[in-house]
Each structure stands twice: as C-alpha cells, then as structure tokens.
Design a protein with these regions (language model features):
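Short beta-strand/loop motif that positions the catalytic acidic residue
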Residues: 464, 470-472
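Catalytic-loop region of hydrolases
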Residues: 25-190, 307-319, 323, 451-454, ...
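Catalytic histidine-centered segment of alpha/beta-hydrolase-like enzymes
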Residues: 502-511
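Alpha-helical transmembrane segments forming the membrane-embedded cores
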Residues: 592-707
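Alpha/beta-hydrolase fold active-site neighborhood
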Residues: 50-54, 315-465, 562-628, 650-653
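Conserved alpha/beta-hydrolase "acid-adjacent" motif
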Residues: 478-482
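A catalytic-pocket lid/entrance helix-loop region that shapes and gates access to the active site
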Residues: 174-184, 252-316, 351, 372-376, ...
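Conserved acidic catalytic loop of the alpha/beta-hydrolase fold
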Residues: 223-237
C-alpha cells in the first residue's frame, strides 16, 4: 500500500483504537533544512560500487536472545524462541555498516486433539517454514501472537523474520507513530495530507543524521537477508510462506535463492514487477463492495434491511468530503485547539479495513448502513471517543521502513498513474485514498535522501518451476484475484487457489488453513486437497444494528473523568445483583412452598410482578452485556455504530422493568397496609421494584433508549 493508502485504510481504526497519526517528533522541519544544508546527499562513490560477492561480509551467525515481546505475548517456555543475526545494511557497498535482524521461532507442537491410536506417534517434520511478513513494515510481534495458535505449528517449526528497518531489526524511526498535536489535526484536507509527507521527511532526515543508508531498505536486500538467514540456520532447504508484501518479497526470494526453497505458498498476491495494477485501490474497493452488495441482495432479509447499501454509503463519503466532521476533543494534550477534525477517509477507510477479515462479513452490511446513517443524521457523538487518546504505535508498523521500500522499489509513478485513472473511473471512492499529486512529492523526498528507484530489471516477473500455491481471497479489498492472475503464467509448477468469501490472506485467517498448508507441504507434488477453500460459504448476514451511543457515552465519560464512571457502574451493578437474586428467589420460592406444603402470605399479586420485574431486569442487563461482548468478538467497530439488533429487545425489557417496578412498589405498599408483611418479604419486594425503576432510568439517562 502507499503512504497515503495506509493512512486511509487505518484511519478509522487509528482514531478509535490508538491515535496513530504518524509524525516523527525528533526531526522537525527546521532540523530537516539544517541537515540538508550541512550534508547534501551524495551519489555513490567508486569505493561503494557493488562487490563481487554480495555475501562476503555476512557472518551467518545467529545469537540467541530473550524474546523482546516476552510478557506481552502469552506463551510457555520452549514454545517460542528468538535470536539476532548480523547482516550488512547494504551489500552493494563495501563500507556499509552492519545491522542486526530479529528472528522469532515458533516451535512445532503436538496438537491437543492428536489421537495416537488412530494416527500413530506424532512427529515434527524436519523441513521448517520461513514466513515473510507483510506491510511492508509489519512488526513480528503481531504475527507471533496470531500464529502461536495457528494450525501450521501442528507439524513444522515456523520462523518469522522481522525484516530490516522494522521493530527490533534496526528500526530507524521508532518514534514515527508518536502523535504531534499540530501536524494532522487540521480542518483542511490538503494540510492533513501534507502532514503525512512532512512525517516521511522528518523520519528520513533523522535517519540520515544517524548515518542510516536508506537505499539499503528495499525488497532485493530483504530477499538476500532471507537467503542469509537460511544459511545461518544451517538448512539446505525450507518452505516459503508469504502474504501481502510477503508475496512480493516471496517472489524476489524465489529468484534469489531457488535452490534453498522446497515448496512455496504466496497469498494476497501483489506482482513483483513495478506494475500500476496494484495501486488501483479504488477499483479494488469498488469490486468488493459490489460483491458484498450482490451477496446481500441474494439474502432476502439482507436485501430488505439494507436497500441501496453502496449508493447511500458513497453519498455519505461525498457528504463528509464536502463537510468535514468537527468535534470537541477530550484530550487537549493531543488536540491543543480543543477541536478534532475527521475527514472522508475515516468514513471510507473503516469498511475497507473490515474487508480484510472474513469474520467481519456477517455484520458488514449492518455496519456500513449504520455508519452511513450516522453521516446522514450528522450524529457524530460516538466518534468523540476517538479523541480520548491512547497514543503509541498500535498497528505494529514501522512506517519508516515502509516509506523506504516504496521509494527504492519505485512505487511513485504507478501510484500517480493508477490514482489518476481511478479518479476518472471511481470518483467517489478514489477521494479517500489521497491526491495523485502526492506521489510526485513523495518521489522528491525519496530522491533528496538517496532512496532512488532500483533498476526495473531486478523486478521482472518470476519464472520458476518450484512447486508453488498462489492463493487469493475473493473478497480481498487490497490484493484481489486480478493481481494474482498477472503472475500465474510465470509459475510452471504452480496452482492457483481461490477462497470464496475470504479476505486478505486466507491461509492466515481461515480456520482450516493450517491443515490445508500442512497437507501441501507434506506432499507438494501430490494431489492438492481443496476441501478447505471449497468449504467457504456465503456469510449469514445479521440484521440492522440497534442504534445506540450508550457504550460510547460511558467510554467518553470514563475518558474525561475516570472517577465519574463509578456512578453508572454502581447504579447498574446494584440493580443487576437485586434482579439476579430476585429471579432465583421468586422462581424457587413456590417450589419450596409446594415441597413444605406451606401457604404463601397474600401480597395482592406483588410476588408475580416482582418475579416479572426480576426476569425483565436480568434479561435486559444480561442481553446488553452479551450484545456488547458479541460485537467486540465479531467486529469491535460495531460499538461505534450500535449493538447487534436483538439487543434492542434487551433495552425494551429494561424499560418494561420500570413500570413493572412502579406497579410492584404500589402493590407492596397496598399489601402492607392490608396485612403486615415480614421485613424480609417487604424488603425484597421494595428493592426489586426500586431496581426496576432504576434500570429504566439508567437506560434513558445513558443513551440505551430503543426508540
């Protein structure tokens, strides 16, 4: 993805989860000018020409270390190990400095459900897998956390190389994601876009001042690192697995070290060649929106609930483009003006990012519809939680390395050309990915810091007979099947596999993918088992969301004053305890009286009303809590637009508890005037009635009204 594509794709998540607007604080514009004046970028000298043996300075030594993510990733001793190995920063320059790269090893483990009687003794395969990460710039920790429970570990060790310039592998702009209050928080779209370029230049200036050779951070050197790692680990061959940018690197590695690769799987494919097709992001987005809407139309309930889904959504994007969102900010350290501004890339980027994971698909029409309705009604209160801060680099991307790759791999011309064409073909969707002219500005920054495009011949299409699976998710919004079709002819021994109704990187995210990969790696030349991709079915779409700002209202309150959350929590907590106790007592008491053959003291119908009140209250609180938990599990962004539709019934039950509580209090008072009641009976009835009234009031006060 491009610099501004990544900004657009993650915009909504960035503001909601981590506020990761990128800007390097250590190198401000004035520092940039000084650095350039003091030491202009020089052309390569004769002493820095390519050496005859590119690996002459590689040591091929691996140094064990304690995993940098220990304490942050849950694993037991012996399951995961880490190491560093040293490589030249630029193998084409004889005087290049050395840097260390971080490698994580996820050790193969016996499956918990392994049946030795049926399958025999479990044995680890001796041919490991090297996983090539995406981004470019994605840090290793996120992959470790995800793959530690992936089925691929049921048979083989999995190595994850944290590529040069990322995380613990000599990240030269570790502070890139730190938030600068003045950089991107502006009411002007052009200034907002320019902030991304300023961040890029600040990072490069800082790297230059630290004597970082930015020209060494490219896909070709990355492939050489993988080659060197194989030799350092002592493997004659291993299996290749790469997704997204890892598919680009995978193609380069297939050319770099063909003798060292036993079999390969590349997924979420982008052609290695510098082809403009990849950058038609708006075209790809329109494609998956059409697929989603067509699938929705095939479902009678979805078609009824969400008519004109995409047309309304595009109109919402246009509306925000014309009228950016302005909100009172919560955290004035991050928003010194007290205001926060959101643009159409937020509205466009949220569903785009959700297309990556197929688990989001059932609720995606509901989310798009709710997001659209938010814009139509200009009800942006839920977005205030995005101004509460969080900071840090929540997306585990080393943006400096990403930018260096885009420079050295020569992306800018393709970006400019494809974005201009998308502007003609898809004028609304293209707006969310930025102005095409930014590509020219990016190219100028690249040139100023010695990160010029490498020769195009190094990126020619792969021609190989290595056994390879080329995999795509049909609903991938960023690397769709048409991209894979470009490179398929170069794989003489390749098989193209599509996963219907799957997103970005199905071999990573589909539940049966581990078994699918293991069977392939066990017998690459054998008949391919396609039962996994063939098991993918059209999602069962959920209905409309229950439009409520209740949870975000509470979150905003907590962000503004942590102590203030005590009132609504204690309020609903006490009611929940009373309801739960009452539901048990009023249900079991009649049974106990039957067993004991004792009569009930007359209460004028108060007991039955108390029972109904307790049941309504328990169902309401439990239903809202369950709906919130389900939303978080399926798609946390749903919480910004509402809750699953059925939780509206839970809110109605809570409102019903109000009049039931009032009736219960009246009946209890009436019964006490007619016949003295034991203190325990009276107290139980009065507390249950009061809890019913309190719950109804809580629902009204905190924004959970179902109408």
């Amino acid at each position: 993805m491009t610099l501004f594509l990544r900004t657009a794709r993650t915009a909504f998540l960035s503001y909601f989860i981590a506020m990761t607007t990128a800007y390097a604080q250590d190198a401000q514009p004035a520092d940039i000018a000084d650095a350039l004046a003091e030491e202009p970028v020089q052309e390569n000298s004769a002493a820095e020409t390519e050496t005859p043996d590119l690996f002459a300075r590689d040591t091929f030594r691996v140094r064990p270390i304690v995993c940098p993510f220990k304490g942050e990733v849950d694993y037991k001793g012996g399951e995961i190990s880490c190491s560093l190995f040293e490589v030249p920063e630029n193998r084409e320059k004889a005087r290049s400095r050395m840097i260390e790269l971080h490698v994580a090893k996820l050790h193969a483990k016996e499956p918990d459900d392994w049946n030795a009687e049926e399958k025999g003794e479990w044995k680890k395969r001796e041919d490991p897998i090297i996983y090539l990460t995406g981004g470019p710039g994605a840090k290793a920790q996120g992959y470790v956390n995800r793959f530690k429970d992936h089925g691929i570990r049921d048979a083989r060790d999995l190595y994850i190389l944290e590529q040069r310039g990322i995380g613990w592998s000599a990240d030269f702009c570790q502070d890139y994601a730190l938030f600068d209050p003045a950089a991107a928080n502006t009411p002007d779209w052009e200034t907002y876009q320019q902030a991304g370029l300023e961040a890029m230049e600040a990072c490069f200036a800082k790297a230059k001042a630290a004597r970082v050779d930015l020209s060494g951070y490219n896909t070709i050197e990355n492939a050489r690192d993988v080659h060197a790692l194989r030799q350092a680990l002592g493997f004659d061959q291993w299996n290749l697995w790469g997704i997204s940018y890892g598919s680009i690197l995978g193609q380069a590695y297939l050319k770099e070290d063909p003798a060292g690769i036993r079999a390969a799987v590349i997924d979420a494919i982008v052609p290695l060649q510098q082809d403009v097709t990849f950058f038609h992001i708006a075209r790809h987005y329109d494609r998956v929106l059409t697929i989603l809407e067509d699938a929705c139309k095939e479902d009678s309930a979805c078609a009824r609930d969400f008519p004109d889904l995409v047309e309304r959504y595009k109109n919402a994007i246009k509306k925000v483009a014309a009228n950016p969102i302005e909100l009172d900010a919560i955290d004035e350290e991050l928003f010194p003006s007290g205001k926060a501004y959101f643009f159409h890339d937020l509205i466009g980027g949220a569903p785009f990012s959700l297309f990556y994971e197929q688990k989001n698909y059932p609720s995606l029409p509901a989310f798009i519809s709710a997001l659209t309705r938010m814009v139509e009604e200009e009800n942006y209160d839920a977005l205030r939680i995005a101004t509460a801060g969080g900071g840090g680099d929540g997306f585990d991307i080393s943006q400096g390395m990403y930018n260096a790759i885009s420079c050295n791999d020569g992306w800018a011309p393709g970006i400019r050309k494809s974005f201009e064409q998308d502007g003609l073909d898809h004028p609304v969707l293209s707006m969310i990915f930025g102005d095409p002219s930014l590509a020219d500005e990016q190219a100028k920054i690249c040139k100023r810091y010695g990160a010029d495009p490498r020769p195009a011949e190094e990126y020619l299409p792969v021609q190989t007979d290595i056994r390879t699976l080329l995999v795509e998710g049909v609903m991938d919004p960023i690397t769709p099947p048409p991209l894979a079709e470009i490179i398929v002819p170069g794989f003489a021994n390749g098989t193209y596999v599509e996963f219907p109704y799957a997103g970005h990187g199905p071999t990573r995210s589909v539940e049966c993918a581990g078994d699918f990969l293991t069977k392939f790696y066990d017998d690459p030349q054998g008949e391919l088992d396609l039962s996994c991709p063939e098991s993918m079915e059209r999602p069962e779409f959920s209905g409309p969301l229950f439009a409520t700002n209740g949870l975000t209202n509470l979150a905003v309150m907590f962000s503004e004053d942590k102590k203030s959350i005590a009132l609504p929590v204690i309020w609903i907590g006490l009611a929940a305890v009373i309801f739960l106790f009452g539901a048990v007592v009023y249900t079991l008491a009649p049974v106990a009286r039957v067993i004991n053959r004792s009569g009930a003291m007359p209460t004028g119908g108060a007991r039955i009303i108390a029972w109904l009140t307790a049941l309504a209250g328990t169902a309401s609180i439990g239903g809202i809590a369950a709906g919130a938990a389900m939303a978080v599990q399926e798609n946390a962004l749903l919480l910004l637009a509402g809750l699953p539709g059925w939780t509206k019934l839970a809110a109605l039950a809570g409102l019903a508890a109000g009049p039931l509580g009032v009736l219960l209090l009246w009946l209890t008072a009436k019964a006490r005037m007619q016949t003295p009641l034991p203190i325990g009976v009276s107290l139980g009835l009065l507390l249950t009635g009061a809890a019913g009234v309190a719950l109804a009031a809580w629902i009204a006060v905190w924004g959970f009204l179902p109408f």
